[in-house]
UniProtKB/Swiss-Prot annotation:
Belongs to the RNA polymerase subunit omega family. GO terms for cellular component: DNA-directed RNA polymerase complex. It is an enzyme of class 2 (transferase). GO terms for biological process: DNA-templated transcription. The keyword Ligase does not apply. This is DNA-directed RNA polymerase subunit omega.
Length: 67
C-alpha cells in the first residue's frame, strides 16, 4: 500500500484548505455510494478520496458541487 502525503495532494490543489474541502466532498460521495475511481481494498472513504486526488482523478472542479 502506497502512502499518501499532503504534498502529493497539494500538487493537484495548491491551497491546503481547498484541498481538504475537496477531499471531504469526494469522501462523502464515496461513502453514499459513488464508485471509487481507483482500486480500493477496504479503505475508508477519506483514504480513497486522498488517493484519487494524489492520482489526479479529480481536482478543484469538485468544489463547484458546493456552490
Amino acid at each position: 500500500m502506497a502512502r499518501i502525503t499532503v504534498e502529493d495532494c497539494l500538487e493537484v490543489i495548491p491551497n491546503r484548505f481547498d484541498m481538504t474541502l475537496a477531499a471531504t466532498v469526494r469522501a462523502r460521495q464515496v461513502s453514499v455510494g459513488s464508485t471509487p475511481m481507483i482500486d480500493s481494498e477496504r479503505d475508508k472513504p477519506i483514504v480513497i478520496a486522498l488517493r484519487e486526488l494524489a492520482q489526479k482523478k479529480y481536482g478543484e472542479e469538485i468544489l463547484n458541487t458546493l456552490r
